[in-house]
């Protein structure tokens, strides 16, 4: 059978919070079967927040969670890494309200999980299987999921910027055949430097810098080291989508398609999916009857 996964040992990391600009300490701790991904805020009495769509409260520029007044911001890159490596059960301790931004991609979190090691557990892994097409729209933006044997993301973005358009704004990734670790994990978040400077004057985005984002001028990329991928912009948006989808609580089996999507539309899609239980099912699989194994290479090489 395909089994649930946790990490083998506790592992720690430290980084800057994108909102506060302060140092955030994070610890990943192994968890038992069916525990799920849960955040624990050590700075507010060890309060817990489950990583699930039901607790999403923030969708502007990033995805944040809240439970009984306790918030955890900017979870999408960490959730994307957990999804890519099939981590079902882990406790994430934080001493702040936000996950550290690290370098603006999910690669540091992938490295962190791999450093801890991955432990297969004794219980069947649960998959979120899409059985019908579910679509949401907001203006000319739209997102949908449909039935698919495996996991695939097809996305088109539309940014009025020379470098973004030159890089390629359309991409489809079939994760049964293409490696998340190689093709997606190193893609960084991006934005206009003038917008960051304006927000910082308002005491916002205090941790944002060229160390954790691709900074854009009106017509160029300002980072001295340039781009990590030729089409890094659309790849980062796919990284975000993988993280947002993992807030369904299980790895998705289906095809996500979108145009000009963001965290808001992803949240609307997840809420719509969960409100239509006849369009999906939670399933377990034996090795020989599973759908085309998404993340197959990444999962096997990570054990």
From Swiss-Prot:
Q: GO CC terms on record?
A: membrane
- Any idea of its EC number? 3.5.1.108
Keyword ATP-binding in the entry? The reply is no
The catalytic site is made up of: 263 (proton donor)
Q: Which cofactor does it need?
A: Zn(2+)
Keywords of this protein's UniProt record, alphabetized?
Hydrolase, Lipid A biosynthesis, Lipid biosynthesis, Lipid metabolism, Metal-binding, Zinc
GO BP annotations listed? lipid A biosynthetic process
Q: Could you tell me what reaction this enzyme catalyses?
A: a UDP-3-O-[(3R)-3-hydroxyacyl]-N-acetyl-alpha-D-glucosamine + H2O = a UDP-3-O-[(3R)-3-hydroxyacyl]-alpha-D-glucosamine + acetate
- Residue ranges annotated as coiled coil are none
Explain the purpose of this protein: Catalyzes the hydrolysis of UDP-3-O-myristoyl-N-acetylglucosamine to form UDP-3-O-myristoylglucosamine and acetate, the committed step in lipid A biosynthesis.
Q: What is this protein called?
A: UDP-3-O-acyl-N-acetylglucosamine deacetylase
């Amino acid at each position: 059978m395909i089994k649930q996964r946790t990490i083998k040992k506790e592992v720690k990391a430290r980084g800057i919070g994108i909102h506060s600009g302060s140092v955030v300490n994070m610890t990943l701790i192994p968890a038992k079967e069916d525990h799920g991904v849960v955040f624990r805020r050590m700075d507010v009495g060890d309060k817990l927040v489950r990583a699930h769509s039901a607790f999403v409260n923030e969708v502007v520029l990033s995805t944040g969670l809240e439970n009984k007044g306790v918030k955890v911001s900017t979870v999408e890159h960490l959730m994307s890494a957990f999804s890519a490596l099939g981590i079902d059960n882990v406790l994430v301790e934080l001493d702040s309200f936000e996950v550290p931004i690290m370098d603006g991609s999910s690669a540091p979190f992938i490295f962190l999980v791999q450093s801890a090691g991955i432990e297969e557990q004794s219980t069947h892994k649960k998959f979120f299987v899409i059985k019908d097409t579910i679509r949401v729209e907001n203006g000319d933006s739209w997102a949908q999921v449909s039935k698919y044997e495996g996991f695939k993301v097809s996305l088109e973005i539309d940014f009025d910027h020379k470098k973004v358009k030159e890089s390629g704004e359309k991409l489809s990734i079939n994760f049964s055949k293409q490696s998340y670790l190689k093709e997606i994990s190193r893609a960084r978040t991006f934005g206009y430097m003038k917008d960051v400077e304006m927000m910082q004057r308002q005491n916002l985005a205090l941790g944002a810098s060229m160390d954790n984002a691709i900074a854009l001028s009106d017509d160029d990329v300002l980072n001295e080291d340039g781009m990590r991928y030729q089409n890094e912009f659309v790849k980062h948006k796919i990284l975000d989508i993988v993280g947002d989808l993992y807030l369904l609580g299980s790895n998705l089996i289906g095809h996500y398609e979108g145009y000009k999507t963001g965290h808001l539309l992803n949240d609307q899609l997840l809420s719509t999916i969960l409100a239509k239980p006849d369009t999906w099912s939670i399933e377990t699989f034996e090795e020989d009857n599973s759908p085309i194994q998404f993340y197959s290479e990444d999962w096997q090489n990570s054990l």
